[in-house]
């Protein structure tokens, strides 16, 4: 990616972030006259820039995923701390997001440390504009993913804990457990030397080709369900959060990239073709009989 493309990407990313922050700030609680949602959106990007500088100077990507996770945790705690509505629902949302972020962030951080580098960044980290754009994209990812929860925490609407919150939490818990189990199964599979250059077909991976992504999509829908009763007015716009996660993981990165890579790597492999024909691409379900 050249400098012009990177700069355009950064501009578009920031424009989308500003739009989301502005719309959701229209019905947000304020602190000293500043919308809580908009303030937290600003801090999200400030965190990215603070860590981007030493990362670029040292030409390292080791703190990229970790920074994303820490941003989720920091903003969740900050928003609850600043909100005048200290409710059980807000605390629950912050805990749900923090638990997910701690688990995923540590998993990705140690995976990169073990592998030595993240090959996505080999060239990117040497190009200022491209690397900077990527950190901005991460900021937008955090904002859009966190949007529904942040909108609920920023909402002036007061609601009582009810069955909708319980249902949403159970959806989140189910998705979280699926993601954790799937990641652990694949990590153990890859750790065995005899599985080098092989694809996993056991455990949850026998029912879905991407169970970890299904789990992540499901848990963010759970977060949105918990957040839903607290929303009003323009804050409903933040319900794009789980939709964004779904599109991102199935159309932009995640599933689409890994499917293309797998078809290229195991092209002509009859066992892989059989696995594709038998196994659901995303939603776990019993393998087809062929």
Regions found by a protein language model. Name each.
Residues 1-14:
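N-terminal membrane topogenic signal
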Residues 3-6, 34-39, 56-64, 206-211:
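Short, amphipathic, aromatic/basic-enriched membrane-interface segments that mark the entry/exit
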Residues 58-74, 117-134, 198-205:
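Juxtamembrane helix-capping/reentrant segments at transmembrane boundaries
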Residues 49-60, 106-113:
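C-terminal ends of transmembrane helices
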Residues 1-2, 23-32, 52-59:
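Short juxtamembrane and helix-loop transition motifs at transmembrane-helix boundaries
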Residues 109-120, 185, 254-259:
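Juxtamembrane/interfacial segments flanking transmembrane helices
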Residues 31-46, 61-73:
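Loop-to-helix transition at the N-terminal end of transmembrane alpha-helices
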Residues 14-24, 28-31, 44, 72-104, ...:
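Hydrophobic transmembrane alpha-helices
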